[in-house]
Every structure is written in C-alpha cells, then in structure tokens.
Regions:
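Glycine-rich phosphate-binding loops of nucleotide-dependent enzymes
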Residues: 1-131
Length: 131
C-alpha cells in the first residue's frame, strides 16, 4: 500500500485513486498503468510511446516522474518513442533504427544533429532539397 501511494504521488495522480478504470481519460488510464508497473518495483521498465494520449500538462509530469523514479530507484528504462523532443529530454542514450538496422547509438543531442538520422527520417527535406 505504501509503495502504491508513493508511485501515485510521484506521478501526480493521487486524485485518481478509487476512480473506476472506465471513468478515466485515455491519458489518465495510461498514467495509472504506468503506476501499476512501477508499484511492482521493476529492475527495468519497457515503455512503448509512454506519452501517447497524454495532454500538454501530463507529458511534463510524466518526464519529471520518470526522472525521479530513475534517480531514486535506479530502475533502467527503455522507451520506444517517435517524439524526438521527448526523447531528447528523457533519455541519456538513444538508439535509432531505420529499415530494421541501427543507424545511430549515442547522445540524444548528437542524434538530433546526425546527418544519417536526418536523412533517414526527413529525407531530402533535412538538407533543403525536395520537390
């Protein structure tokens, strides 16, 4: 019980306690799902697009919560995410895949400036070309 209360507090969703799942918004339901996973005190947490469906207030809260949990527990986190801004804020290491191959492994800021990453995801638009 104590761990559950801690996780709800860290995620900023103590007000959702006791609300039936069917009464939650999509974003709130995702945060409750994350809380459920964190309550189990995992060694590693794998998340597929954790910010999907969250509103503009929930995303910063999610980022702050993940940073706090990582700092306090040492829980390793793997995110599968297409939101480059979120990745740059939340991650200390980025692996970029394109067409089934790894094209980058390193610092998030370096990934944003990597010509191979730009080319793979922006095509000619990354270099001022295009039609």
């Amino acid at each position: 019980r104590q761990r559950s209360e801690y996780v709800l507090e860290v995620l900023g969703i103590t007000d959702l306690e006791g609300i039936p799942a069917g009464g939650l918004s999509h974003g709130s339901a995702r945060l409750v799902g994350l809380a459920r996973a964190l309550a189990a005190q995992p060694k590693y947490l794998i998340m597929d697009e954790p910010a999907a469906g969250l509103n503009e207030h929930e995303v910063p809260a999610l980022l702050a919560a993940l940073a706090k949990v990582r700092e306090e527990t040492g829980c390793g986190m793997l995110l599968v995410e297409h939101n480059v801004g979120l990745v740059a804020q939340a991650c200390s290491r980025v692996v970029v895949l394109a067409a089934g191959s790894m094209i980058f492994d390193g610092d998030p800021q370096a990934a944003l400036n990597d010509e191979g990453v730009k080319s793979a995801y922006l095509g000619d638009a990354a270099f001022g070309g295009g039609h």
